[in-house]
Amino acid sequence: MNTYNDNPKQCLKKIVESASAKFNESVDIAVNLGVDSRKSEEQVRGTVVLPKGIGKNIKVAVFAQDKHLLEAEKAGADIAGGEDLVEEIKKGRKLDVDWCITTPDFMAKITPIAKVLGVKGLMPNPKFGTVTSNIAEAIKTIKSGQVKFGTDKNGVIHGKLGNIKFDIDDLLENLKAFLKVIKDNKPISAKGIYFKGVFLNSTMGKAYKIGKVEDII
Protein backbone atom coordinates (compact mmCIF):
# COMPACT_ATOMS: atom_id res chain seq x y z
CA MET A 1 0.00 0.00 0.00
CA ASN A 2 1.28 3.44 -0.88
CA THR A 3 0.63 6.45 1.32
CA TYR A 4 0.52 10.07 0.19
CA ASN A 5 -0.12 11.95 3.39
CA ASP A 6 -2.33 15.02 3.05
CA ASN A 7 -2.21 14.77 -0.73
CA PRO A 8 -5.43 13.21 -2.03
CA LYS A 9 -4.94 14.77 -5.46
CA GLN A 10 -1.68 12.87 -5.85
CA CYS A 11 -3.43 9.66 -4.79
CA LEU A 12 -6.16 10.16 -7.36
CA LYS A 13 -3.62 10.94 -10.06
CA LYS A 14 -1.73 7.72 -9.32
CA ILE A 15 -4.96 5.71 -9.36
CA VAL A 16 -6.04 7.06 -12.74
CA GLU A 17 -2.59 6.74 -14.30
CA SER A 18 -2.06 3.16 -13.11
CA ALA A 19 -5.49 1.81 -14.09
CA SER A 20 -4.87 -0.98 -16.59
CA ALA A 21 -8.12 -2.92 -16.90
CA LYS A 22 -9.82 -3.11 -20.29
CA PHE A 23 -12.98 -1.51 -18.93
CA ASN A 24 -13.83 1.84 -17.40
CA GLU A 25 -12.85 1.24 -13.77
CA SER A 26 -14.67 3.07 -11.01
CA VAL A 27 -12.79 5.10 -8.41
CA ASP A 28 -13.78 3.73 -5.03
CA ILE A 29 -13.46 4.98 -1.48
CA ALA A 30 -13.41 3.17 1.86
CA VAL A 31 -13.71 5.23 5.04
CA ASN A 32 -12.83 3.49 8.30
CA LEU A 33 -14.61 5.28 11.14
CA GLY A 34 -14.05 5.18 14.88
CA VAL A 35 -17.60 4.07 15.65
CA ASP A 36 -19.23 0.95 17.05
CA SER A 37 -21.70 -0.07 14.34
CA ARG A 38 -23.28 -2.59 16.70
CA LYS A 39 -24.87 0.39 18.41
CA SER A 40 -27.73 1.93 16.44
CA GLU A 41 -26.80 5.41 17.62
CA GLU A 42 -23.32 5.04 16.11
CA GLN A 43 -24.37 3.84 12.67
CA VAL A 44 -23.49 6.53 10.16
CA ARG A 45 -25.96 6.63 7.27
CA GLY A 46 -27.26 9.18 4.83
CA THR A 47 -27.04 10.56 1.32
CA VAL A 48 -24.69 12.90 -0.47
CA VAL A 49 -24.95 14.66 -3.80
CA LEU A 50 -21.61 14.32 -5.55
CA PRO A 51 -21.16 17.68 -7.34
CA LYS A 52 -19.59 16.11 -10.42
CA GLY A 53 -21.98 13.17 -10.63
CA ILE A 54 -21.02 9.50 -10.61
CA GLY A 55 -20.35 8.99 -14.30
CA LYS A 56 -23.52 7.13 -15.20
CA ASN A 57 -27.22 7.69 -15.69
CA ILE A 58 -28.97 7.22 -12.36
CA LYS A 59 -32.26 5.39 -12.86
CA VAL A 60 -35.29 6.31 -10.77
CA ALA A 61 -38.65 4.59 -10.27
CA VAL A 62 -41.60 6.49 -8.83
CA PHE A 63 -44.65 5.02 -7.13
CA ALA A 64 -47.45 7.58 -7.09
CA GLN A 65 -50.92 8.44 -8.34
CA ASP A 66 -52.85 11.27 -9.98
CA LYS A 67 -50.93 14.55 -10.34
CA HIS A 68 -47.78 13.13 -8.75
CA LEU A 69 -47.62 10.41 -11.39
CA LEU A 70 -47.81 13.00 -14.16
CA GLU A 71 -45.19 15.08 -12.36
CA ALA A 72 -42.85 12.07 -12.20
CA GLU A 73 -43.18 11.34 -15.92
CA LYS A 74 -42.58 14.98 -16.79
CA ALA A 75 -39.54 15.18 -14.49
CA GLY A 76 -37.81 12.27 -16.20
CA ALA A 77 -38.56 9.23 -14.05
CA ASP A 78 -37.31 6.08 -15.77
CA ILE A 79 -40.28 4.11 -14.43
CA ALA A 80 -43.48 5.58 -13.03
CA GLY A 81 -46.63 3.84 -11.94
CA GLY A 82 -49.25 3.38 -9.27
CA GLU A 83 -50.99 0.32 -7.92
CA ASP A 84 -50.59 -1.34 -11.33
CA LEU A 85 -46.80 -1.15 -11.00
CA VAL A 86 -46.97 -2.55 -7.47
CA GLU A 87 -49.00 -5.50 -8.78
CA GLU A 88 -46.50 -6.14 -11.58
CA ILE A 89 -43.65 -6.26 -9.08
CA LYS A 90 -45.63 -8.61 -6.83
CA LYS A 91 -45.92 -10.91 -9.84
CA GLY A 92 -42.17 -10.88 -10.44
CA ARG A 93 -41.35 -7.82 -12.52
CA LYS A 94 -37.72 -6.79 -11.97
CA LEU A 95 -36.81 -3.18 -11.25
CA ASP A 96 -33.55 -2.15 -12.88
CA VAL A 97 -33.20 1.17 -11.04
CA ASP A 98 -30.93 2.82 -8.48
CA TRP A 99 -33.60 4.65 -6.46
CA CYS A 100 -37.31 4.41 -5.71
CA ILE A 101 -39.43 7.40 -4.71
CA THR A 102 -42.98 7.59 -3.43
CA THR A 103 -45.33 10.13 -1.87
CA PRO A 104 -46.51 10.09 1.77
CA ASP A 105 -50.06 9.22 0.71
CA PHE A 106 -48.88 6.28 -1.43
CA MET A 107 -46.38 4.83 1.05
CA ALA A 108 -48.86 2.36 2.54
CA LYS A 109 -49.67 1.02 -0.93
CA ILE A 110 -46.12 -0.20 -1.53
CA THR A 111 -46.12 -2.21 1.72
CA PRO A 112 -46.83 -5.47 -0.19
CA ILE A 113 -43.49 -5.10 -2.03
CA ALA A 114 -41.51 -3.66 0.89
CA LYS A 115 -39.46 -6.83 1.26
CA VAL A 116 -38.63 -6.96 -2.45
CA LEU A 117 -37.51 -3.33 -2.45
CA GLY A 118 -35.76 -3.60 0.90
CA VAL A 119 -33.51 -6.47 -0.17
CA LYS A 120 -32.20 -4.29 -3.00
CA GLY A 121 -31.86 -1.21 -0.81
CA LEU A 122 -34.60 0.52 -2.80
CA MET A 123 -37.30 1.01 -0.16
CA PRO A 124 -38.26 4.72 -0.04
CA ASN A 125 -37.16 6.39 3.17
CA PRO A 126 -37.97 9.90 4.47
CA LYS A 127 -34.37 10.17 5.73
CA PHE A 128 -33.15 9.83 2.15
CA GLY A 129 -35.68 12.31 0.77
CA THR A 130 -37.43 9.55 -1.17
CA VAL A 131 -40.80 9.85 0.56
CA THR A 132 -41.89 13.28 -0.56
CA SER A 133 -44.65 15.29 -2.16
CA ASN A 134 -42.11 17.18 -4.28
CA ILE A 135 -41.45 14.41 -6.78
CA ALA A 136 -39.82 16.60 -9.43
CA GLU A 137 -37.27 18.04 -7.02
CA ALA A 138 -36.41 14.58 -5.65
CA ILE A 139 -35.83 13.22 -9.16
CA LYS A 140 -33.67 16.21 -10.07
CA THR A 141 -31.55 15.85 -6.92
CA ILE A 142 -31.02 12.12 -7.33
CA LYS A 143 -30.16 12.30 -11.01
CA SER A 144 -27.64 15.07 -10.35
CA GLY A 145 -25.47 12.56 -8.48
CA GLN A 146 -27.03 11.55 -5.17
CA VAL A 147 -25.71 8.38 -3.56
CA LYS A 148 -26.45 6.54 -0.32
CA PHE A 149 -23.80 5.65 2.23
CA GLY A 150 -23.71 3.71 5.46
CA THR A 151 -21.31 1.95 7.80
CA ASP A 152 -21.00 -1.82 7.57
CA LYS A 153 -20.61 -4.07 10.62
CA ASN A 154 -16.94 -3.07 10.88
CA GLY A 155 -17.61 0.66 10.86
CA VAL A 156 -16.45 1.11 7.26
CA ILE A 157 -18.27 3.15 4.60
CA HIS A 158 -17.75 2.10 0.98
CA GLY A 159 -18.62 4.31 -1.96
CA LYS A 160 -17.80 5.40 -5.49
CA LEU A 161 -16.47 8.82 -6.49
CA GLY A 162 -16.70 8.40 -10.25
CA ASN A 163 -14.48 6.58 -12.74
CA ILE A 164 -11.00 6.80 -14.21
CA LYS A 165 -12.23 8.95 -17.12
CA PHE A 166 -13.10 11.76 -14.71
CA ASP A 167 -10.89 14.83 -14.47
CA ILE A 168 -8.70 14.63 -11.35
CA ASP A 169 -10.13 17.88 -9.97
CA ASP A 170 -13.67 16.55 -10.42
CA LEU A 171 -12.81 13.40 -8.48
CA LEU A 172 -11.24 15.56 -5.79
CA GLU A 173 -14.38 17.68 -5.54
CA ASN A 174 -16.52 14.56 -5.16
CA LEU A 175 -14.12 13.24 -2.52
CA LYS A 176 -14.38 16.42 -0.47
CA ALA A 177 -18.19 16.42 -0.67
CA PHE A 178 -18.33 12.75 0.39
CA LEU A 179 -16.05 13.24 3.39
CA LYS A 180 -17.74 16.46 4.49
CA VAL A 181 -21.15 14.80 4.74
CA ILE A 182 -19.66 11.91 6.72
CA LYS A 183 -18.01 14.43 9.03
CA ASP A 184 -21.31 16.30 9.46
CA ASN A 185 -23.02 13.01 10.38
CA LYS A 186 -20.61 12.14 13.20
CA PRO A 187 -22.56 10.48 16.03
CA ILE A 188 -22.63 12.45 19.27
CA SER A 189 -21.63 9.31 21.17
CA ALA A 190 -18.56 8.59 19.01
CA LYS A 191 -15.37 9.08 21.02
CA GLY A 192 -11.73 9.28 20.04
CA ILE A 193 -10.49 9.46 16.46
CA TYR A 194 -13.43 9.61 14.03
CA PHE A 195 -11.62 9.21 10.69
CA LYS A 196 -9.33 6.23 11.34
CA GLY A 197 -8.38 5.78 7.70
CA VAL A 198 -9.48 6.80 4.21
CA PHE A 199 -8.47 4.65 1.25
CA LEU A 200 -8.89 5.20 -2.49
CA ASN A 201 -8.53 2.73 -5.33
CA SER A 202 -9.77 1.85 -8.79
CA THR A 203 -11.81 -1.32 -9.33
CA MET A 204 -8.78 -3.47 -10.13
CA GLY A 205 -6.04 -1.28 -8.66
CA LYS A 206 -4.21 -1.11 -5.36
CA ALA A 207 -5.37 1.12 -2.53
CA TYR A 208 -3.83 4.43 -1.55
CA LYS A 209 -4.27 5.87 1.91
CA ILE A 210 -4.80 9.61 2.15
CA GLY A 211 -3.68 11.73 5.06
CA LYS A 212 -5.47 13.83 7.62
CA VAL A 213 -9.08 14.27 6.53
CA GLU A 214 -9.63 17.45 8.52
CA ASP A 215 -7.03 19.23 6.37
CA ILE A 216 -8.83 18.20 3.19
CA ILE A 217 -12.32 19.37 4.08
UniProtKB/Swiss-Prot annotation:
CC terms in the record's Gene Ontology section: large ribosomal subunit
Tagged with keyword Coiled coil:
no
Q: Where are the transmembrane segments?
A: none
- Tell me the Pfam families matching this sequence: Ribosomal_L1 (PF00687)
UniProt KW Repeat keyword: no
Q: What does this protein do?
A: Binds directly to 23S rRNA. The L1 stalk is quite mobile in the ribosome, and is involved in E site tRNA release. Protein L1 is also a translational repressor protein, it controls the translation of the L11 operon by binding to its mRNA.
Q: How does it assemble?
A: Part of the 50S ribosomal subunit.
Q: Which family does it belong to?
A: Belongs to the universal ribosomal protein uL1 family.
Q: Which PANTHER family match?
A: 54S RIBOSOMAL PROTEIN L1, MITOCHONDRIAL, LARGE RIBOSOMAL SUBUNIT PROTEIN UL1M
Protein name as catalogued: Large ribosomal subunit protein uL1
Q: Which organism is it from?
A: Wolbachia pipientis wMel
Q: Which gene underlies this protein?
A: rplA
